[in-house]
């Protein structure tokens, strides 16, 4: 599995190059949204291959999820769960290349143990490369639409007017914010907590400038490759992408939602770390 993991990381890094500037241009047209690609073992996003153990490191959880595609964390996705007065359902959103178990095998059970109704999902996986354990690699806008459908399902099951989000990387940044700002989510979310969330786009340690310098013919080829393999999310998260500008052009936040962002100077993927921070232009917190 070490070889597979290294290959996966390498492929994901290459995808950053292959998905960048051309996809950012395509993002200006809603008609160009790549259709959502479902994970075979997670119909409608719901992991359907049993429940796995709790892991304390992401690498261990990732390894287990690769051997058990579609596995879920303990305690999540109980659609008969009764939300306690004053609480809201908590939706855990993985990041790019993540999945429900690899990202949330530790947090999911602990939140459920504290009495929260907890939900998570995996969707928008690659085509013809990697496997379905690498979720949310496709067009962020398609993932945002899928998030909206998941939110509505949770709200209907629990009778709750609003939900709380806890998201990692893409799942705490551009994905929930695209849903909130572009797909009617503003009235359905009470809190958004982002863990190392690239709200203003990442420089990917200089890859953004490298991509900008590629010849147009190379960009066109790589754009087609990333579309064919459903890997657009990497480029859409680079600093300056058209989708970043579209999502954040009217400010970072919207009224009525409480925002929390937790960042670290030690992150080597979402760089610089200051791109993680919200301004206080419209936030409740």
Where are the language model's segments positioned?
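Conserved small/polar residues in nucleotide/adenosyl-binding loops
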Residues: 278-285
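Short beta-strand/loop motif that positions the catalytic acidic residue
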Residues: 261-263
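Acidic catalytic loop of the alpha/beta-hydrolase fold
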Residues: 266-270
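Flexible, membrane-associating and regulatory peripheral segments of lipid-active enzymes
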Residues: 2-110
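Catalytic nucleophile-loop/oxyanion-hole region of alpha/beta-hydrolase
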Residues: 130-146
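Short alpha-helix in the alpha/beta-hydrolase fold that links the catalytic acid
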Residues: 271-277
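Conserved alpha/beta-hydrolase
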Residues: 112-129
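Serine-dependent carboxylesterase/thioesterase catalytic core
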Residues: 94, 143-247
